[in-house]
Amino acid sequence: MRRLATLVLLGTALSACSVAKDVKAGQMKVAHFHALLNAGNFDQIAAEADPGMHWPTRGPSFKDYLSSIHRKLGFCSSWRMTSFNEQLGLGGAVQINADTHCDADNAQESFVFSSGDLRLRGYAVTSRALVVS
């Protein structure tokens, strides 16, 4: 029984190290996304996204969506992670939710990255400025 408890504790400790590493890598990806968004490099954001990223075929393209967000929110200067979730296994994902301060208004963002290479698989943003402007 003691051996089993030791193995469980060791497995938990090792997975905690992996999660901490993934949190830091995910935070770096969010910072990179904001740097590209602020610079107007929407093509690069789309090019670096996961090939499996699902975007509706009707309506604006992903690049047009990003351009509209940038135009309405302005420069996004800082952000704070509000939650982190990692789904392990085949097709796993890392999700980061954030409160972001932008020139026009604060925004709530949700990023979904593919496990491993952390390529953008999904993005959503909400803000009053996106609705009224």
Regions found by a protein language model. Give the residues of each.
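Exposed beta-sheet edge and beta->alpha loop/turn motif
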Residues: 83-133
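Short N-terminal helix-initiation segments at or just after the protein's N-terminus
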Residues: 37-46, 118
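Sec-dependent signal peptide recognition
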Residues: 2-7
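C-terminal motif of bacterial Sec signal peptides marking the signal peptidase cleavage site
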Residues: 14-16
